Amino acid sequence: MNTFCHSTIAARIETAAAAIILFLTTLTSCGRSSSPEPLDQWNDGTSTLHTADPVIAEGRKLFNDKEYQNFRLTGEALTQPGSEAGLLFHTDGESGYEVIFRNGDIDGTRKSGSLASVRNLYRSLAKDGEWFDFEITVRGQNIIVCINGTEVVCYTEPGYPYRTEEHARQLLSQGSIALQGIHGEVSFRNLAIERLA
């Protein structure tokens, strides 16, 4: 038996296996520039709150001090009957986009996952009184919103989007993440954000 032939084949197999592992590692981290980190520092204008599980009451607004452009934000939310909150991104308090958190019966109000004034949803995939998962991904001109693992919004901002005067600054750029209470009280937990390339 020719041992040279077997050792050459073994070396080639080992090299090919290493290349495949490198390829798969690169593939699974494609577009990621960091691993998820807790979104746990908020400012309400008077004090700083350190929690990845904020509760947002009507009229309250919390800002994260960091700036984000391309990201994947995950977490869980809990609404009560009649409660509503918004999660804003690429915001300075006036600009950017807002994802709505509100559940309940079909009654003409925007439901969880709505990209406010752009893609409004009127049927909820989650229930009041039960925690539900959400994910918001922004990359380039694309916004994807998922509720309980189901994609509910896939929006690509055009070069010159139509906007009413009220929403003229609702554009992708970069900015902070904010939570705002609209009605009642909405709880969030396990908020985490991952910067994307």
Q: Residue spans of the language-model regions?
A:
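Bacterial N-terminal signal peptides that target proteins for export
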Residues: 3-17
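Intrinsically disordered, low-complexity serine/threonine-rich segments
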Residues: 7-10, 26, 32
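Carbohydrate-interacting regions of secretory-pathway proteins
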Residues: 30-197
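Bacterial N-terminal signal peptides
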Residues: 16-26
